[in-house]
């Protein structure tokens, strides 16, 4: 808040208190404030001079507030309550705060007419000026700027081409550009539609460019602020001071120091720096404990580090306490010692001996002139390079001073009635104020006048944009100039440069291609290819397909660019600029490596200018790298997943198996929208897949099985950090691997059923929608109906508290069954079953496949005394009564015990061990280190990983583990397919059965067999037996969600019986020492009783309607309904009312009329009037939508009944009531009029209204009395409506004007008052 606003607030508060004190009844307003009540702003109680008020609907401890506190809060929001009509709302209850206006004693009872008239005229002109300014600003900035952008783009394109699309017609070329359509006409409607298309395209382009710039800026800002970035810079260019420079700098700062001491200091600082670097390198290496004892890697630690000499450590600590080698040293001496302000001008020195105590150290000071000679660039970038020893000293001194300052300030605050602590003004050796000390003072709250006396009165930087007519035009001109310059920089120049680059690249590519062609023929490879095609004809077919589809398209684009025949293509137009940008990025990346070549941690770069250039280039390189990775992961992945879902699921179901994709066909009206559709589909799939993985991870499988899929709770997840330090190739390979896994799940999981199994193997259409119900456009009713049905079905299923526990029960059973059959219970579930630790060997095939149970019962010690395979074969020959033996196999293995283990720790896992946890084979740590070093890249040692959860379990792993694991994944896919297909077909069969045998007979009985509704429903029911019906599936799944309750209770009962049943043959399962999970969503205890009390439909209704999205959609629907009704009413009133009356009067008076609708002349020739009517109607509809939006935000948090009541009342007032008042009388008059007119006289009804058409019918020789009466009543009705509205508006205007004049001329002030209690 600036000084002027403080003065205004104080003056306003004093005036209001003065006015309030003059009122005799002010004190009575606060009699209801209870004792102990406090102000919610200052927490103070009420006094006689400063009472408490409750001016809003807040209750409880936040009910009351002081008037002075409220005025300060209002002033902080830049609201002037002294202005007429100023309104302040509470931030908590959003209710207007109650103020009482106090008028002057000499205010007359009636406002003088002259004053009222003058104020009204001034107010009218002021509002007209404001409306004109706002309208002009809206037109220029919202409409004009995008069109200017579009026209400059076309102008630059014509400059690059050297010709215009329509030679000789610059205006047409500027409006239409390079369009594929036929030669357009310069008519008003055609130009308007073209400008509308240009505006929509440019707006999308502008939004994407803004998003791109914001993303790049914030990523750049985050990167340079990341801690690891400064370490990466240090790794590339090292410290600014080499050992030689460090010695020379120490010698310059301490000229009295001998060479031996300088050598010692430089060596100690260098040793400490190397020690820090070695600690960083050790992060890549494996724990040293694993090298000493390969059997203990649970708690890794480094035991091989040699002990350090305590004297060396103490020497270096003494070194750290040496006074700073910069100007902060003088400030420290002045603050801590309270010595005189005189500073020595000569060269002072003190000798520091190794091992001396820090208490005996003497401060060293350097000359002020030497410090002034220090380069400014060196000071600017000191904080960016952490390991530099001198910078480390400076940072430590600055931190100590800051801590001392904070402590002193805190002590001063804690002492009662203590003066505010103000740091003394620090001066350097040259006598200048130290800016760092000023920053410290400002950081702890020192007033600006004390921190820097020269900066008094300077407030925050605010862009002062005043809304004036000339300013609007000036800002628009600035925007036009900026648009021209920006497009020239971002489009014109890069495209021009790209032309030359593409010529170079195409030339190089041609040379390489010709060389490859010559090599192909000279090496005789064409002979081998011809022989291969004769042996395998499919090779020739595949190469022909590649040539026709891929190579042909590439050649087509190449010819279109080189011959300039594809001027309308956006890709061809963007190719040169894109080439320039990619080349620039490559140059930046290469330049950063070139500038830093020859430098490193051992050999630092000392040139500050070169360091600055490298830091800029390196920051840009990192920004491009991170942006590419983020774009691939956030946009590329979802879009690619959406394309694969379209190929494997949506296209076969909603289109045809003969087609590849379906989404581009429904987005034909605007092809770029298909990318958004793909992104939405892919994002939703990835979200649901992540939820499925989370459910399995949390409730079913053992912790640590999915360690390769990072958990959201993983402390090692540092996205920006990992994106910076890991090589681009490694990260791209990980992304490709993730996308490959998604592709397997999508293409094989869905595409096998929709494109192979059902259409080809089963020859069935059960996974295909009937042709009549396939959506063809994204705006068609079929598509939107399917979309809404799927959305509400999802909401209903999620609202059921039985579906999720039932799904968890299903997958627990599946995983338990599959793991037991594959002997993976120990590895997957964490339950060690002894019977799975081997296999049973039978005497022969008869006992193995026919009499397996008898063979197992023949050995009473089958599992208690296992045998080897040789022992079993020997016993089969010796013991004839035993037909089966248990032979153990497999190994025990170390596996991660958590999903959030560190990456380096995982490298030591999955090794076989004995029962005593002894390694069967020593770890090859050197190979692991080398592999980690290759994978980590140049900055891998900077990767700091959390090792808190680095522990392991010992589990049993059977033979052929990989095959069994892949089989488990296949079984999971099989049972997921059974679940999805089973629910789909059961749901459709259920609803089809109910409709065929329940609803259809009733409809046939009520409506008859030939009724259209019955026939259509009967055809749909017949088709549903052989085709997929999405509506039946959705309704049936909702019904099954109700049945899920009974299924869940039945399975719980079965589980209870199974738990009490005793199986003599079952061997007890031994669970690992694994912590118990938190069982969320327990099936019995977590069941929502709302469904049992109110019924499932009320629960579903409550869950759906409580959604903010549903409320928003309801608001949009009501706004559209109101807009449609208001448009229809306006059209009827205009045509059947106003223009009909106008035509009747002009025909009766002048014998003809200016406007005709019956012959469609008004539509053909009077386009300007139609445009004006459309603009007025659009403004009215916009106002209606804005009112509905305000109503939605005002009531979005209310209950559903109040929200429905409010929106329905708004629809009634704005829609139906308006229609009844204005349209119903006209319709009644029209019906009465038509009773007296023969059918032959009613012509051209399709082009206009009946009454208006009949009024212009030339077949009427004379006007009948009924016609005169009709038009007379119509004129009377319209006149009455007009004068009634004018009267209402005049009364409202008069009351508002009188009140505004009172508030502006006679207002003495406004005082706070209590909110009246609701009775």
Curated annotation (Swiss-Prot):
Cellular localisation: Endoplasmic reticulum membrane; Nucleus inner membrane
Entry GO CC: Doa10p ubiquitin ligase complex; endoplasmic reticulum; endoplasmic reticulum membrane; membrane; nuclear envelope; nuclear inner membrane
Ranges of biased composition (kind: Low complexity): 291-306
Binding site residues for Zn(2+) 2: 56, 58, 90, 93
CDD domains reported for this sequence: RING_CH-C4HC3_MARCH6 (cd16702)
Zinc finger residue extent: RING-CH-type: 31-100
EC number per UniProt: 2.3.2.27
InterPro entries recorded: Znf_RING-CH, Znf_RING/FYVE/PHD
Keyword Nucleus part of the UniProt annotation: yes
Record note on quaternary structure: Component of the DOA10 ubiquitin ligase complex which contains E3 ligase SSM4/DOA10 and CDC48-binding protein UBX2/SEL1. The DOA10 complex interacts with the heterotrimeric CDC48-NPL4-UFD1 ATPase complex which is recruited by UBX2/SEL1 via its interaction with CDC48. Interacts with its associated ubiquitin conjugating enzymes UBC6 and UBC7 with its membrane anchor CUE1. Interacts with PEX29.
Designated name of the protein: ERAD-associated E3 ubiquitin-protein ligase DOA10
């Amino acid at each position: 808040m600036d000084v002027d606003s403080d003065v205004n607030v104080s003056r306003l508060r004093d005036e209001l208190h003065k006015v309030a004190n003059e009122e005799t009844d002010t004190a009575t307003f606060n009699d209801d404030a209870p004792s102990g009540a406090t102000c919610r702003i200052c927490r103070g109680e009420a006094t006689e001079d400063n009472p408490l008020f409750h001016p809003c609907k807040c209750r409880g401890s936040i009910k009351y507030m002081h008037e002075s506190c409220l005025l300060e809060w209002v002033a902080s929001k830049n609201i002037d309550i002294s202005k007429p009509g100023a309104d302040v709302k509470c931030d908590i209850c959003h209710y207007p705060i109650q103020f009482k206006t106090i008028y002057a004693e000499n205010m007359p009872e009636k406002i003088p007419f002259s004053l009222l008239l003058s104020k009204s005229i001034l107010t009218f002109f002021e509002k007209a000026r404001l409306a004109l300014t706002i309208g002009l600003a809206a037109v220029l900035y919202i409409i004009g700027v995008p069109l200017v952008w579009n026209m400059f783009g076309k102008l630059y394109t014509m400059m690059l081409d050297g010709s215009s699309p329509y030679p000789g017609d610059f205006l047409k070329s500027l409006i239409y550009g390079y369009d594929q359509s036929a030669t357009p006409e310069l008519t008003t409607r055609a130009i308007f539609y073209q400008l509308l298309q240009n505006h929509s395209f440019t707006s999308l382009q502008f939004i994407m460019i803004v998003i791109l710039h914001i993303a790049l800026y914030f990523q750049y800002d985050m990167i340079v602020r990341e801690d690891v970035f400064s370490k990466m810079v240090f790794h590339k260019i090292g410290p600014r001071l080499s050992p030689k420079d460090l010695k020379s700098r120490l010698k310059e700062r301490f000229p009295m120091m001998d060479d031996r001491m300088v050598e010692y200091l430089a060596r100690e600082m260098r040793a400490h720096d190397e020690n820090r670097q070695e600690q960083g390198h050790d992060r890549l290496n494996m724990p040293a404990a694993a090298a000493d004892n390969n059997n203990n890697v649970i708690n890794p630690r480094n035991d091989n580090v040699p002990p350090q000499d305590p004297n060396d450590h103490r020497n270096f600590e003494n070194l750290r306490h040496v006074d700073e080698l910069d100007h902060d040293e003088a400030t420290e001496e002045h603050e801590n010692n309270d010595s005189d302000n005189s500073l020595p001008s000569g060269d002072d020195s003190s000798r520091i001996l190794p091992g001396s105590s820090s208490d005996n150290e003497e401060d060293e000071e350097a000359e002020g002139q030497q410090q002034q000679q220090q380069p400014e660039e060196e000071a600017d970038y000191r904080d960016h390079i952490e390991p530099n020893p001198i910078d480390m000293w400076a940072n430590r001194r600055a931190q100590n001073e800051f801590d001392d300052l904070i402590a002193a300030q805190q002590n001063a605050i804690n002492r009662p009635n203590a003066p505010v602590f103000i740091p003394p003004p620090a001066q350097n050796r040259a006598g200048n104020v130290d800016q760092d000390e000023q920053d410290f003072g400002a950081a702890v709250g020192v007033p600006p006048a004390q921190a820097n006396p020269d900066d008094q009165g300077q407030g925050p930087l605010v862009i002062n944009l005043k809304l004036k007519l000339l300013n609007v035009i000036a800002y628009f001109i600035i925007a036009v100039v900026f648009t021209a310059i920006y497009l020239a920089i971002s489009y014109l120049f890069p495209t021009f440069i790209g032309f030359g680059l593409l010529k170079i690249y195409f030339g190089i590519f041609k040379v390489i291609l010709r060389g490859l062609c010559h090599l192909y023929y000279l090496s005789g490879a064409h002979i081998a290819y011809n022989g291969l095609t004769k042996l395998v004809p499919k090779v020739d077919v595949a190469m022909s397909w590649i040539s026709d589809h891929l190579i042909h398209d590439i050649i087509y684009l190449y010819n279109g660019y080189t011959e300039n025949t594809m001027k309308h293509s956006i890709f061809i137009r963007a190719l040169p600029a894109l080439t320039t940008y990619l080349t620039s990025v490559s140059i930046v990346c290469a330049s950063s490596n070139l500038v830093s070549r020859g430098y490193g941690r051992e050999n630092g770069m000392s040139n500050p200018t070169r360091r600055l250039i490298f830091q800029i280039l390196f920051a840009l390189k990192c920004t491009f790298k991170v942006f590419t990775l983020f774009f691939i992961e956030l946009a590329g992945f979802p879009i690619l997943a959406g394309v694969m879902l379209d190929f494997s699921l949506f296209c076969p179901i909603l289109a045809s198996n003969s087609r590849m994709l379906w989404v581009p066909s429904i987005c034909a009206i605007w092809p770029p929208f298909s990318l958004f559709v793909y992104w939405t589909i892919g994002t939703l799939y990835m979200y649901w897949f992540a939820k499925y993985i989370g459910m399995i991870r949390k409730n079913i499988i053992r912790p640590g099985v999915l360690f390769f899929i990072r958990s959201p709770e993983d402390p090692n997840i540092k996205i920006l950090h990992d994106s910076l330090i890991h090589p681009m190739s490694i990260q791209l390979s990980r992304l490709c691997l993730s996308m490959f896994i998604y592709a397997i799940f999508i293409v094989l999981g869905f595409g096998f059923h929709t494109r192979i199994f059902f259409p080809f193997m089963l020859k069935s259409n059960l996974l295909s929608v009937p042709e009549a119900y396939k959506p063809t456009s994204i705006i068609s009713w079929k598509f939107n109906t399917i979309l809404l049905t799927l959305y509400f079905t999802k909401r209903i299923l999620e609202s059921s508290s039985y579906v999720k526990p039932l799904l968890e029960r299903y997958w627990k059973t599946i995983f338990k069954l599959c793991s037991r059959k594959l002997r993976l219970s120990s590895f997957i579930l964490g339950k060690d079953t002894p019977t799975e630790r081997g296999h049973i060997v039978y005497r022969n095939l008869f006992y193995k496949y026919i009499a397996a149970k008898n063979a197992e019962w023949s050995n009473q010690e089958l599992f208690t005394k296992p045998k080897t395979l040789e022992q079993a074969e020997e016993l089969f020959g010796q013991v004839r009564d035993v037909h089966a033996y248990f032979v153990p196999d497999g190994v025990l293995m170390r596996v991660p015990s958590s999903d959030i283990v560190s990456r380096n720790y995982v490298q030591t896992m999955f090794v076989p061990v004995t029962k005593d946890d002894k390694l069967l084979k020593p770890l090859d740590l050197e190979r692991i280190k080398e592999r980690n070093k290759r994978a980590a890249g140049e900055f891998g040692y900077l990767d700091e990983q959390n090792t808190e959860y680095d522990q392991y379990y010992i589990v049993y792993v059977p033979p052929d583990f990989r095959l069994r694991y892949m089989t488990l994944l296949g079984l999971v896919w099989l049972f997921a397919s059974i679940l999805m297909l089973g629910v789909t077909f059961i749901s459709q069969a259920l609803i089809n059965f109910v409709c065929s045998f329940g609803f259809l007979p009733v409809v046939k009985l009520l409506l008859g067999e030939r009724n259209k509704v019955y026939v259509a429903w009967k055809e749909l029911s017949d088709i549903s037996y052989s085709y997929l019906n999405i509506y039946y599936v959705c309704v049936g799944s909702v019904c099954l969600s109700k049945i899920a309750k009974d299924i869940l209770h039945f399975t719980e009962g079965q589980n209870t019986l199974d738990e009490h049943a005793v199986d003599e043959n079952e061997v007890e399962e031994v669970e690992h020492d694994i912590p118990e999970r938190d069982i969320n969503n327990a099936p019995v205890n977590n069941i929502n009783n709302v469904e049992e009390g109110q019924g499932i439909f009320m629960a579903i209704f409550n869950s759906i309607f409580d959604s903010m999205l549903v409320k928003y959609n309801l608001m949009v629907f009501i706004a559209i309904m109101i807009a449609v009704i208001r448009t229809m009413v306006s059209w009827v009133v205009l045509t059947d009312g106003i223009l009909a009356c106008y035509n009747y009067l002009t025909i009766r008076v002048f014998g003809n009329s200016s406007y005709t609708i019956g012959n469609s002349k008004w539509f053909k020739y009077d386009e300007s009037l139609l445009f004006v009517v459309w603009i007025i109607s659009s403004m009215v509809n916009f106002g209606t939508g804005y009112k509905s939006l305000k109503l939605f935000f005002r009531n979005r948090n209310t209950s559903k009944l109040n929200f429905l009541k409010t929106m329905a009342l708004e629809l009634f007032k704005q829609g139906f009531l308006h229609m009844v008042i204005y349209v119903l009388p006209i319709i009644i008059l029209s019906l009465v009029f038509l009773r007296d007119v023969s059918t032959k006289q009613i012509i051209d009804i399709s082009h206009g209204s009946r009454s208006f058409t009949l009024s212009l019918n030339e077949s009427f020789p004379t006007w009948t009395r009924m016609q005169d009466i009709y038009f007379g009543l119509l004129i009377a009705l319209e006149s009455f409506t007009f004068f009634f509205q004018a009267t209402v508006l005049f009364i409202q205007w008069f009351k508002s004007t009188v009140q505004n004049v009172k508030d502006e001329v006679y207002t003495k002030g406004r005082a706070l008052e209590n909110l009246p209690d609701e009775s």
